[in-house]
């Protein structure tokens, strides 16, 4: 974080009567252990700890002021910036800081593929200048301001991921980040329990337009029926990408799955035709690559160099990471899951070169009333995916196993991580491949820890 006047950073939060003079701030923190002289400490109430309990100590250690939800005993009023919502306070601080710098910003949202697309955008752009990106899962109203604070005078580009659970969240994130280009990867059913329908999810994702300037490119998946039907704001310029539809602005043709990723021909009506290879499996990752390409080139960056950058992208965490373990290929995809990403992973795995295919699938969370139907649909997909055996874990995934078994697939339901690991150790042999996928909350990596440790 660059040094910035406190009066600028606190605009819209602190009343004019608070006198900060020429004081400058080089740190905004929510962690009392990080407090240093001249910083701003934002107190967050939590289940285990309440930041308000540390507000007085933060001032003792030199904080310029504290942002609190209510008056705190021992904290002078002249050092207290009152804001009933700590998340709102962070967003205002982040937006005020962002307004002082002028990098080109790509904003990425969508139901599936946000993080991979963010990584591909970063790979496409970083060769053109100093570039930052959202780290980890910092894609919400606490994490996005933290990303803004990492922008500096020498930052030329930023790739910012925007997540949501409810209407209005993407709008607030977009107004804070003020992207120059927006991406919506697709409209799925994640958080449908909160939003009610995919139409409402589409409206929520389109809130990214709130922070886009007049004439800004909005990169959209032309194969998504909800985006195709959506009414777009007049101030944005849609850029459509597609897997196979040559009428789209950018399309992928001759898509091939190879041992180490995907290859395809990219046709861009503006820039020409390119052969692209990406180190990621599945047609869905081709779509992610197209989105990243569209965003980078519509920023005015050289298309050939963008294509080379995308070819060097690196996946993060447990997202379709291929591990070669004692002759068995394990595709670790247990960071997150929803019906669309499950189907995409199974479609990819069906083409994976190996002797036998095994899948360990767990619950998909936050699906509300659609949960039973969605898990049963995954069971039908699994039965058509060329699997030798399906192992399931989790209460909802039982329905996946029941439906898959009814269609003739050999299935096994594990009630514990130990049972799942034992099944894999008993069944799998060198030359086989394993797909592991579930929502983050299912923690299927614990099965893999046992499996790797005890492989003969």
Give residue spans per PLM region.
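N-terminal leader/targeting and accessory segments in enzymes
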Residues: 1-92, 352-354, 380-381, 385-395, ...
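Residue-level signal for inorganic ion chemistry
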Residues: 9, 39, 58, 93, ...
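Phosphate-binding loop of NTP-binding sites
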Residues: 10-11, 89-217, 222, 226-235, ...
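Active-site beta-alpha connecting loops in nucleotide-dependent enzymes
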Residues: 46-49, 316, 334-407, 456
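Short acidic/polar active-site loop segments enriched in Thr and Asp
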Residues: 64-65, 104, 156, 180, ...
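Acidic, Mg2+-coordinating active-site environments of NTP-dependent enzymes
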Residues: 68, 72-77, 183-330, 354-355, ...
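Peripheral docking tails and interdomain loops at the edges
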Residues: 413, 431-452
């Amino acid at each position: 974080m660059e040094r910035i006047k406190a009066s600028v950073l606190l605009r819209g939060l602190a009343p004019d009567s608070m006198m900060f003079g020429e004081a400058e701030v080089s740190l905004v923190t929510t962690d009392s252990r990080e407090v240093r002289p001249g910083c701003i400490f934002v107190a967050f109430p939590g289940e285990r700890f309440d930041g308000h309990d540390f507000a007085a100590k933060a001032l003792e250690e030199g904080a310029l002021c504290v942002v609190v939800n209510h008056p705190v005993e021992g904290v002078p009023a002249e050092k207290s910036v009152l804001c009933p919502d700590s998340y709102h306070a962070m967003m205002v601080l982040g937006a005020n800081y962002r307004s002082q710098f002028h990098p080109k910003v790509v904003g990425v949202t969508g139901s599936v593929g946000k993080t991979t697309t963010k990584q591909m955008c970063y790979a496409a752009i970083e060769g053109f200048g100093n570039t930052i990106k959202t780290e980890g899962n910092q894609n919400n109203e606490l994490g996005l301001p933290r990303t803004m604070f990492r922008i500096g005078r020498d930052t030329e580009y930023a790739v910012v991921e925007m997540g949501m659970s409810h209407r209005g969240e993407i709008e607030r994130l977009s107004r804070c980040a003020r992207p120059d280009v927006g991406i919506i990867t697709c409209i799925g059913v994640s958080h449908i329990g909160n939003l009610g329908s995919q139409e409402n999810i589409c409206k929520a994702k389109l809130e990214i337009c709130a922070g886009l300037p007049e004439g800004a490119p909005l990169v959209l998946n032309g194969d998504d029926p909800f985006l195709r039907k959506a009414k777009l704001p007049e101030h944005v310029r849609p850029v459509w990408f597609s897997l196979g539809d040559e009428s789209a602005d950018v399309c992928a043709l001759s898509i091939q799955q190879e041992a180490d990723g995907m290859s395809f021909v990219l046709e861009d009506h503006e820039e020409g035709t390119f052969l692209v290879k990406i180190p990621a499996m599945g047609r869905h990752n081709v779509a992610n690559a197209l989105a990243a390409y569209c965003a980078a080139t519509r920023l005015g960056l050289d298309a050939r160099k963008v294509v080379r950058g995308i070819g060097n992208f690196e996946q993060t965490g447990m997202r379709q990471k291929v591990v070669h373990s004692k002759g068995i290929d394990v595709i670790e995809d247990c960071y997150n899951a929803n019906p669309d990403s499950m189907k995409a992973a199974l479609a990819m795995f069906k083409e994976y070169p190996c002797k036998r295919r095994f899948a360990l699938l767990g619950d998909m969370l936050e699906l509300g009333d659609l949960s039973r139907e969605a898990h049963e649909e995954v069971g039908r997909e699994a039965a058509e995916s060329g699997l030798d055996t399906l192992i399931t874990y989790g209460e909802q995934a039982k329905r996946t196993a029941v439906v898959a078994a009814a269609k003739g697939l050999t299935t096994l339901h594990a009630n514990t991580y130990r049972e799942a690991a034992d099944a894999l150790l008993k069944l799998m042999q060198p030359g086989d491949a394993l797909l592991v996928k579930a929502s983050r909350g299912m923690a299927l990596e614990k099965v893999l820890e046992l499996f790797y440790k005890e492989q003969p």
